[in-house]
UniProtKB/Swiss-Prot annotation, chains A, B:
It comes from Kluyveromyces lactis (strain ATCC 8585 / CBS 2359 / DSM 70799 / NBRC 1267 / NRRL Y-1140 / WM37) (Yeast). The gene is HRI1. This is Protein HRI1. GO terms for cellular component: cytoplasm; nucleus. Its main location: cytoplasm. It is found in: Cytoplasm; Nucleus. Belongs to the HRI1 family. InterPro entries: Hri1 (IPR031818), Hri1_N (IPR038744), Hri1_N_sf (IPR043047).
Length: 241, 241
């Protein structure tokens, strides 16, 4: 089951909640995932993102708690905070619980340790609205299980001497992260979010980084195929086409 | 400007938030309003609503705080808690602040006094997602100001010896409250929520009460006109048709 969820709020407990980003998290049928978190008002910000991360299914551990709740332990392969070595941000596994409310929204709670595992625990809450990934607008799903089972579920990956990256396609929504290896500054980070419109053209919504043109120009591909963009070869590691 | 907002969460501070209802609040151009709050899982509930209330624009006082925030003081004409005399619920004016977040969601904070004005203050938070009232699905608006200026904005009212009621139409969404005067039990309460579909037929979504058939069967009417449903005469007190 693919999933596209739009964040409704972020809360560092016990501070009041807020939402300053347009955050979308995409997950494929096989559990590959990316979350891209651009600020709505990015004026004056050199890096116009709160955060971005992603990984393949081997970077996430899911356990069912009950019909309504799962525990998810994330150990991101890609993490802009780690890449940039942002001080006072978490390293390593993040333990979370995802709980579905009657209304269909999904509450995520967990803890991070910005000052190391021996440091102060910071509890957080995020709230997620499942949206229909096959639509270009944000059309709410009553429950994330109501998602179209036939929606595109595609993942592309690159890992060569110079670059490592991941692109996730769910329905009409594409999100991507591309890191230049060994470059731990903004020059090493590329992010994008696009939509596949009714004519199957890719329309860019968010694009960041010197190498952003290396994100794949075509994504509706079969598993095992290769697509090259500005010299960078991407492998399709999952596709339901 | 009409408004249709879907509640995302309800929080009695400092308890954790939750959302067990599908709550919609509708407000017309002139400021007449209704909020209907049915539980998603109403099994076993004699009254399957958390609450419902409404009023005309003279039952609300709005003051601008800044570009992002307004204070709103509600003094409902219709309030199911008051009608049923539910113990430990608020009476009289409720003072609230509505603040628009960067993401377009609207945070409402305020206090109620369930044990009277001298009793304990209970702080609450609600969070609202503006949705497009001209659509049958829940299509999110980036900002409530993005609403279609031509959307239907209609209010119907009844106040005779036996009944008092209000119906609010914004876009394709209709919500209504009808009280039987002097009957302070569930027998005196009627609530409904409907949609006007593409064929201009009214499709019922929520319908409660012995007199629910008295809600108007036609609502796309001019200001000043009268429509009668099962003997009950409704006056159109606002219409932009």
């Amino acid at each position: 089951m693919v999933s596209l969820t739009k964040r409704v709020l972020f809360e560092v407990i016990p501070n009041p909640p807020d939402e300053t980003t347009l955050t979308l998290s995409s997950t494929t049928n096989k559990g590959h995932y990316i979350s891209v978190r651009p600020f709505v008002n990015a004026e004056g910000k050199e890096f116009p993102f709160e955060w971005a991360f992603g990984g393949t299914s081997d970077h996430i551990e899911l356990k069912k708690i009950n019909e309504r709740a799962n525990s998810l332990n994330f150990n991101f392969k890609f993490d802009t905070n780690v890449k940039l070595n942002v001080p006072e941000t978490h390293r390593g596994v993040i333990k979370t619980v995802f709980k579905t409310w009657d209304s269909g929204l999904v509450e995520e709670t967990g803890s991070v340790f910005p000052w190391g595992t021996e440091g102060t625990e910071v509890k957080f809450r995020e709230l997620w609205q499942p949206v229909d990934p096959t639509r270009l607008e944000f059309v709410e799903l009553n429950n994330e299980k109501d998602v179209d089972q036939a929606a595109n579920s595609i993942a592309l990956s690159v890992d060569n001497e110079e670059y490592e990256g991941l692109v996730i396609v769910v329905g009409r929504w594409i999100q991507g992260i591309l890191f230049k290896k060994g470059v731990n500054t903004l020059d090493g980070i590329n992010l994008f979010r696009s939509q596949i419109d009714e004519k199957n053209s890719i329309v860019s919504l968010v694009k960041f980084g010197a190498d952003a043109d290396k994100f794949p120009q075509e994504v509706l591909l079969n598993e095992g195929s290769i697509t090259t963009s500005k010299g960078l070869e991407w492998s399709v590691i999952e596709s339901n086409l």
